[in-house]
């Protein structure tokens, strides 16, 4: 499932014209679809539910705190490899998870 689509030669993200977002926030601009992110996380969780996995989001991949918050809200733990990554993941972990789960090697 992808919540990005072209309509009448304009790109939309979750029914919002991307051009409108660029006009409001300027460019370059990173745009994420919360619905797409959550959908894919739930697919992974469902596929492995028999073994009760802890899916951990790699903060190194994208340390955006808003993305970390979405992942925590939907049951994700965090994979961190530095103090900075831990600093971003810990506050959302304590807020949204029953037991904060931070994994680091």
Across the structure, where does each feature detected by a protein language model lie?
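Single conserved hydrophobic/aromatic residue that forms the stacking wall/gate
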Residues: 96-105
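A charged N-terminal "starter" segment
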Residues: 1-97
